[in-house]
Amino acid sequence: MSPAEMNSVVNSVFIAPEAGDVIKGSGGLRKARVALAGRGKSGGARVIYWYRNEGFPVVLLWAFSKNETENITKSQLAILVKYSETLQRDFRRRK
């Protein structure tokens, strides 16, 4: 994914963080499809991110082009879930 494409992915998520689908069994992580120039949504990027509500920031965890990989593995998801649990704990302490 080029830097310009990554910028497009980041902007899409930050504009509408609730648009992504919640990933089953992830504790609330979201996955969104983002269209890339000339590829459309089905051939575009996927982004996995952490977002709770307006009181928390959006944290981009992983972005990838569909042509790079179709989806993440269960073990990769488990790592992201552990990280998201740490994020939630840390942000709650700050409030």
Predicted regions located by residue number:
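Amphipathic alpha-helical transducer elements in NTP-driven molecular machines
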Residues: 3-6, 42, 77
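Basic/aromatic recognition patch in beta-strand/loop cores that engages polyanionic ligands
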Residues: 19-64, 68
